[in-house]
Amino acid sequence: MIEEISVRFQGGKIVEAHAARGNQVLQRMIETDEGARRLGEVSLVPHSSPIASSGLLFLNTLFDENAACHIALGQAYSTCLKDGDTLTPEQLASRGANNSLIHVDWMIGSNRIDVDGISAAGDSEPVMRAGEWV
């Protein structure tokens, strides 16, 4: 397990990464390919989600990721884009979908998460406060 991950993004790409535990695994992971240093998923999950409220750690990403906000490095899910399952890799890339051999999730949620959306006009709108939907 990789714990206490810290990353710095520049231009949409990880330029620095460190983990208190599992750092060598993290470094190898982000060196897999060019897409491994970019986000493939961002998911907002309220701190009060039923799985989070259960207090259980399943040690299974498919369950645990539903307990907290999470991000994933690597491959984007094409099915998250309109008609994504019919698009070529080039069309997916033109729509901003990342391509990589990996898709690795990690949880970042807590009751301290604040998220703001930025409109096309540059205005900031609160989306989450203290880990909950506004």
Enumerate the predicted regions with their spans.
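Metal/cofactor-centered catalytic core regions of large enzymes
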Residues: M1-V134
